[in-house]
């Protein structure tokens, strides 16, 4: 009886997963779905407490050892730097792997049947598609050119790329569903056909590559099983042609992408979006910083959840993004899960994480070789293709961060491992009592609930903080920021410490001494966040601690040489300190900014001092008279400076040319 309840609970859990979406949090799905998963595990554990005849697979098996080692390394790598983000990442990983282990044992003990998981995952795919088509139709009715703004189609997920990857991960279940009942078969066919237009619209290249690898794997196996050597050669020839087509695309289509960027044609714009390599180039720069981060702590890494805090340390100006260089856009991940693990958990952590996949691959190959029924064998091939596609996507995106992606991946793993041990004769069961496992999983679920609950409340108040700050209601900003911060939540989803918002509020309320306390605390939590450093330096200057101000402005510029606010502020500090040459040197390295009013306001007085210094040094009356005739307004000084930049000469050279 309880087995049926658990099966239905799993099915309903999977169907409701996409609907767990709260607009009142910073990320509408991340924390809510962790809470949902932890609550579901508690329910399953409660239902299992009275299940006495549950056989436990020995914990010394390779998969369990690899998972345990990975989690242990995640904890050890964070030693000495265990932050609120470490709590979050660790709680998420613990609850996800607990879901895997419980599901494996439920399948192994026949308490849960695979069909319920298959149907539930098919349901996720169908619901995702319904949401995607709803967004497509809604935005089209609103007059949006949806092929140019495909990012508006997100369904129940955070962005279009995550939607595309979730549809890919449902593909193996759709294919397995073709061998199920007539109703499930029809739904699977509808799902696969409906996914094609959505995937084309989204244009997520990592998913296209994953689909290509998935199809290639299926093709290779099909050729191996069904055809003779000639047809295999023909098939391999087709693969070579496909590779050549990709080469042609890279070398002929991509270079011409700029030519169609300004085209008004919808199809041309779509192909430009697909061919545009700017996103990939940007990500390689993220990866460069990540490699530099790993080299500093190659064995154990910087600690779970700390990539986002450490990333700016390795330079932001090379990102080729104005918003990143100026700290208005921040990064939370390197868009490569394996690189993220390498940075946070070190080389040991990455090796152990890869071992988890290695064990699963070994089990799948064993199952494919030793399964006699063709339909069942193909099911394992679909799972193999799905896991391989996931690995491909993980090299260019961050499915590891997302609960829904991890649930589907863990279901891949659970089906594989339970099937593997069902075919292998276990010499002995685990000597650890079942109740101990239940206590452990209960503790993990409660830990995930506590961390998630505090972060959920923190994100709710952070959203209110954003709104109050945008409308410059500083009293409200301070109130909501105080409510947002707690033991498990000190940095928001944009990698900005909550104390920074408190500092901003106090600064605008003229409580400068208190703002300094909060900015120093924010700096402690995020020592390389340039907005935090800039505000801390400005506060030091306001309170008369000029040396500290200069030190921190220089640190901000060292991290991002193109950080305009810090350059302007440092130039102003040098100017006020009568270090005019240094003030000119700092502001002269800025790119000419025609929109920032402070740029011109600060530049002209510094240029006046520079002109006076040149005239005093040269002591040339002719030059002085000519400049006096040419410069009658401050705008004329600015024009001379612009001319020097256009002529690619120094400001002093431009002045001397006026003799």
Name what the model sees in each region:
Residues 8-20, 37-47, 68-80, 88-105, ...:
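Alpha-helical transmembrane segments of multi-pass inner-membrane proteins
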Residues 491, 495, 529, 563, ...:
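Residue-level recognition of tetratricopeptide repeat
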Residues 487, 491, 525, 559, ...:
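Structural marker of alpha-solenoid helical repeat scaffolds
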Residues 1-75, 83-89, 95-123, 177-189, ...:
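Transmembrane signal-anchor hairpin modules in multi-pass inner-membrane enzymes, especially those
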Residues 500-504, 531-541, 565-572:
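Conserved alpha-helical positions within TPR/SEL1-like repeat arrays
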Residues 140-152, 254-282, 288-295, 304-343:
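Interfacial juxtamembrane loops and adjacent helix segments
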């Amino acid at each position: 009886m309880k087995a049926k309840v658990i099966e239905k609970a799993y099915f309903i859990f999977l169907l409701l997963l996409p609907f767990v979406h709260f607009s009142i949090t910073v990320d509408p799905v991340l924390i809510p779905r962790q809470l949902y998963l932890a609550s579901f595990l508690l329910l399953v554990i409660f239902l299992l407490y009275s299940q006495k005849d549950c056989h436990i697979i020995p914990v010394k098996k390779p998969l369990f050892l690899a998972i345990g080692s990975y989690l242990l390394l995640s904890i050890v790598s964070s030693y000495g730097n265990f932050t609120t983000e470490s709590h979050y990442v660790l709680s998420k990983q613990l609850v996800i792997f607990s879901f895997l282990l419980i599901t494996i044992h439920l399948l192994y003990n026949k308490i849960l049947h695979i069909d319920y998981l298959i149907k539930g995952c098919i349901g996720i795919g169908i619901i995702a598609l319904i949401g995607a088509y709803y967004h497509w139709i809604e935005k089209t009715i609103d007059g949006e050119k949806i092929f140019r703004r495909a990012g508006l189609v997100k369904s129940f997920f955070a962005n279009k790329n995550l939607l595309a990857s979730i549809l890919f991960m449902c593909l193996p279940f759709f294919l397995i569903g073709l061998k199920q009942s007539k109703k499930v078969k029809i739904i699977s066919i509808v799902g696969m056909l409906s996914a094609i237009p959505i995937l084309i619209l989204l244009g997520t290249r990592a998913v296209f590559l994953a689909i290509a690898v998935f199809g290639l794997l299926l093709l290779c196996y099909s050729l191996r099983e069904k055809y003779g050597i000639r047809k295999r050669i023909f098939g391999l020839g087709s693969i070579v042609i496909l590779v050549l087509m990709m080469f042609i695309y890279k070398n002929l289509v991509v270079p011409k992408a700029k030519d169609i960027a300004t085209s008004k044609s919808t199809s041309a714009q779509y192909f430009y979006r697909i061919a545009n390599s700017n996103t990939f180039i940007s990500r390689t720069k993220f990866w460069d910083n990540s490699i530099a981060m790993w080299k500093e702590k190659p064995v154990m890494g910087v600690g779970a959840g700390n990539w986002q805090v450490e990333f700016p340390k390795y330079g932001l100006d090379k990102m080729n993004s104005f918003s990143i260089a100026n700290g208005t856009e921040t990064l939370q991940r390197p868009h490569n899960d394996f690189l993220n693990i390498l940075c946070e958990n070190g080389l040991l952590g990455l090796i152990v994480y890869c071992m988890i996949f290695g064990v699963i691959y070994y089990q799948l190959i064993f199952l494919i070789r030793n399964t006699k029924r063709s339909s069942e064998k193909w099911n394992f091939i679909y799972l193999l293709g799905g896991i391989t596609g996931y690995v491909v996507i993980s090299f260019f995106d961050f499915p590891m961060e997302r609960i829904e992606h991890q649930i589907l991946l863990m279901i891949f793993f659970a089906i594989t491992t339970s099937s593997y041990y069902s075919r292998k004769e276990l010499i002995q069961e685990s000597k650890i009592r079942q109740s101990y496992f239940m206590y452990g999983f209960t503790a993990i679920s409660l830990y995930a609930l506590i961390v998630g609950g505090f972060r959920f409340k923190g994100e709710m108040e952070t959203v209110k903080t954003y709104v109050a700050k945008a409308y410059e209601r500083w009293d409200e900003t301070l109130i909501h920021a105080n409510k947002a911060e707690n033991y498990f939540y000190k940095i928001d989803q944009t990698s900005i410490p909550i104390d920074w918002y408190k500092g901003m509020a106090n600064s605008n309320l003229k409580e400068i001494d208190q703002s300094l306390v909060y900015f120093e605390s924010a700096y402690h939590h995020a020592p390389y966040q340039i907005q935090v450093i800039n505000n801390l330096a400005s506060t030091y200057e306001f309170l008369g601690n000029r040396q500290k101000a200069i030190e921190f402005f220089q640190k901000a510029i060292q991290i991002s040489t193109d950080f305009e606010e810090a350059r302007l502020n440092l130039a102003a500090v040098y100017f006020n300190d009568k270090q005019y040459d240094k003030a000119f040197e700092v502001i002269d390295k800025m790119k000419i900014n025609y929109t920032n009013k402070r740029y011109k306001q600060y530049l002209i007085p510094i240029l006046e001092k520079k002109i006076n210094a040149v005239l005093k040094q040269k002591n040339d009356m002719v030059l002085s008279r000519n400049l006096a005739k040419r410069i009658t307004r401050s705008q004329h000084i600015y024009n001379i400076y612009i001319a020097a930049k256009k002529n690619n000469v120094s400001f002093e050279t431009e002045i001397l040319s006026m003799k």
